[in-house]
UniProtKB/Swiss-Prot annotation:
Mn(2+) binds at residues 21, 209, 211, 245. It holds the Pfam family HCS_D2. This is 2-isopropylmalate synthase. The keyword Amino-acid biosynthesis applies. Belongs to the alpha-IPM synthase/homocitrate synthase family. LeuA type 1 subfamily. It is an enzyme of class 2 (transferase). It catalyses: 3-methyl-2-oxobutanoate + acetyl-CoA + H2O = (2S)-2-isopropylmalate + CoA + H(+). It comes from the Bacteria. Catalyzes the condensation of the acetyl group of acetyl-CoA with 3-methyl-2-oxobutanoate (2-ketoisovalerate) to form 3-carboxy-3-hydroxy-4-methylpentanoate (2-isopropylmalate). Keywords: Amino-acid biosynthesis, Branched-chain amino acid biosynthesis, Cytoplasm, Leucine biosynthesis, Manganese, Metal-binding, Transferase. Residues 12-274 form the Pyruvate carboxyltransferase domain. Its cofactor is Mn(2+).
Amino acid sequence: MTAPHTSANDRVIIFDTTLRDGEQCPGATMTFEEKLEVASLLDSMGVDVIEAGFPIASDGDFEAVHEIAKRAKNAVICGLSRAGAKDIDRCAEAIKPAKQGRIHTFLSTSPVHMKYKLQMDAAQVYELVISSVTRARNHTDNVEWSSEDGTRTEFDFLCKCVEAAIKAGASTINIPDTVGYSVPEEYYDLFKRVRENVPNSDKAIFSVHCHDDLGMAVANSLAGIRGGARQIECTVNGIGERAGNTALEEVVMAMKVRNDKLPYWNKIDTTMLTRASKVVSAATSFPVQYNKAIVGRNAFAHESGIHQDGMLKNAETYEIMLPESVGVKQTSLVMGKHSGRHAFIHKLEEMGYKLGQNQLEDAFVRFKALADRKKDIYDEDIEALVDLEIAQSHDRIKLVSLTVIAGTHGPQRATMKLDVDGQTKIEEAEGNGPVDAVFNCIKALVPHVAKLELYQVHAVTEGTDAQAEVSVRLSHEGRSVTSRASDPDTLVASAKAYLGALNKIVMKRQRDMAAPAAAAS
């Protein structure tokens, strides 16, 4: 927890929108179960407000928000809504089970948005601000209003809309830098001036929401806080549309490490930041770049001889924060084929995993199989293995075995055995290379029209026996799904990743088919 100050005026509310704005990032779609896991972790680590989704967008989004609202223990559960009555009412229904619920309604206010997107004039927009907030306020006393494209909105009109929204009952006012256009000095000045010019500004909490199109989302968010905002809207790993959103882990640690210049506090348990990063990365199949601040693999790694020498003498020579403060251990416990079940369970608990008995047994079997093929097992290996086990626990299509014949001459041929809904299927296929042969096998065993958009491979750890981690993105009916899998055998990892994406498509189709039936009953 980052709380050296006790003044309520210095407290910053952390509003996480990983499950809403983050999931809007192309290819970052999460399953229902993955959303519940991410929400549970965010709740546990001290996030104040979880924006769980956009209920009107789909039945799946509604169900996820509704279920998260049921399960949340501490966080306010928020749903996003446009300004229309149907949107607001649907959002209210979704958050109804929450101990603390919030409706977040928004409306564009910039000249370019009003003219081309809304095709409305300023007077119409102003009236809609009032009516939408009033309707939301009839459902809950916790209403947030956002001025979409607020940083490109004419200042006087922005102040007029903010004043009206507060008067209509909004307790939080968000002025987002929707297109990532602002610079810190400008964003600081905007909040300072709005708060000075809106007569009832003291009756609401002001919020920042920044995008990273110019690489300044974190800097702008902190500038907005200095300008008087007291809520930061952010996502784990900074995922989001286009270049992404403000990274939760970065703003939280900036306030903690540089509290001398940023004298604010929040309730986040920073030791859970790395775990949150890994869970979101696994759920979205978006790898975290190695040099990512705070949670990147190299954030606490030192290879230069000069740096290593300094670190050995005193860690403060090159580290401005302790690795343990963000949940990173300085040393990795190396495990191998002689490690037993007890040691494995202890290691999982140490790493923050909580598995069911069946998942635990399956993960241990996978671990022992990996240990027989790999000399040393590192934390990264175990994370990759367990994340795959969690992802596959709901799969309807599972890989049983794979044999590939490849070489410099002759065709590349793959033979694959799959378990499809409990039924074993075997097929052989050729391809232009071993990976193509593997994917052709899958297409023969499970006929589908999904298109391969992305295929990437990188090593989980170092060495010739390192596990390969493969990312596969498939597009189906205008929707992209991404999956990752790891294995010492690159071709096996490729098959698992492709099947993982295919399983997501199957689960999505199954949920879409179930929704009308549930509504009819």
